[in-house]
Amino acid sequence: MSTVIENLGKLDRKVTLAVPKAEVEQEKQSRLARLSKTVKMSGFRPGKVPMKMVEKQYGQQVEMEVRFDKAARQFFDITNEQGVKVAGQPRFELKSEGVADDQFAFDATFEVYPEVKIGDLAGAELTRTKTEITDAEIDKTIDILRKQRVHYHPRGEAGDHGDGGEAVAQNGDRVTVDFVGTIDGVEFAGGKAEGFGFVLGEGRMLPEFEQATLGLKQGESKVFPLAFPADYHGKDVAGKTAEFTVTLKQVEWAHLPEINGAFAQSLGIADGSLDKMRADIRENLEREVKRRTHALLKDQVMDALLKVAELDVPKSLIEQDQERLVEMARRDLEARGMPNVKNMPIPAEMFAQQAERRVKLGLVLAEVVKVNALEAKPEQIKAEIEEFAKSYEDPKEVIRWYYGDQQRLAEMEAYVLENNVVNFVCDKAKVADKAMSFEELTATQGAQG
């Protein structure tokens, strides 16, 4: 049989393989002999099953395995000898016509990696975001940290934690209510609750509901109409008007911690220094700015590379990546607590576009790295790990954690190499700086998902 690799198209190839039947039979008998030592059958002790019975039970299955194993081994020997870079997995089809009596023949069809051409990057226009952390941003962060440590105390009570006034619901208060809603006098699903709590002003409830609750005294009730929006998530009530009765059972005011030494210590500042606290917050925000601005620039660089790149993308690699994305989605759903995820059908087609971009980008990046001899230097990897470790309580332990596992180290090496590609493209392209506030930066990142 010829071992000439046939060209079927841009990336598609075919090679015909011949496997001697004698070799298959010899390997089949060898595997059955090994299997007979452990196989279990009713009426026989393990290892004492007659060979004829083992062959009758497992012979056909073992023979098929041997055929394809030998075909696969021959396939990879041929492609390696001829320097062919196989993309994805080959598909083997057993031939039935034009085959010698003493052979099994297979047609192996497969794809090869494409030639990748990277065009001129000089015309690419990129924007490098510049964001400065101001004292106002630090103050906002401190406010957020205070709200995360809020304590609620009953309104209308005296004492250290009482406000001494009336128990009247105000904006920012945490309220506990009973409510019941009806449409045309009939209660509806989800329209009734007892002991339901929420914070006024956070927007968790519809505006009309919050407005009706504001100003209520503890123990007081109110009847009011509420028009559900047409796009409301509850389809049974969307676009309809309900009548609600709400009763205020409890109202609590928010007590935010004071900005003092104790507050600073709660944030990990051992000596309670407010200056150190602010410096620490600034450092964390600047680290976040660096991460976000780099992500924005990296996205632009990847888009620029895809625009100037010319290549055909192997379908087999796209299909493999679709399956990876399906499994990633399944693990994500499991992590979120969704039941029966293993049996849930997740169509791979929904990831087709994403998978094609990922595969194409991977091929383009590999070509840029190879042609321009880019590499992740040990000192770059070390610096990146140390920078990452700074955000943890025990940086030295994080550094040991990275260097203690080759897989984690390889992931960091890939990250550094990708950064080097970004820097390489920026050196070739036209890059303009653009000022952006921290609020705008976080909003931009949020919009991108």
Swiss-Prot record:
InterPro entries according to UniProt: PPIase_dom_sf (IPR046357), PPIase_FKBP_dom (IPR001179), Trig_fac (IPR005215), Trigger_fac_C (IPR008880), Trigger_fac_C_sf (IPR037041), Trigger_fac_ribosome-bd_bac (IPR008881), Trigger_fac_ribosome-bd_sf (IPR036611), Trigger_fact/SurA_dom_sf (IPR027304)
Predominant location: cytoplasm
A GO molecular-function descriptor: protein folding chaperone
Enzyme Commission designation: 5.2.1.8
UniProt xrefs under SUPFAM superfamilies: FKBP-like, Triger factor/SurA peptide-binding domain-like, Trigger factor ribosome-binding domain
Region forming the signal peptide: none
Protein name: Trigger factor
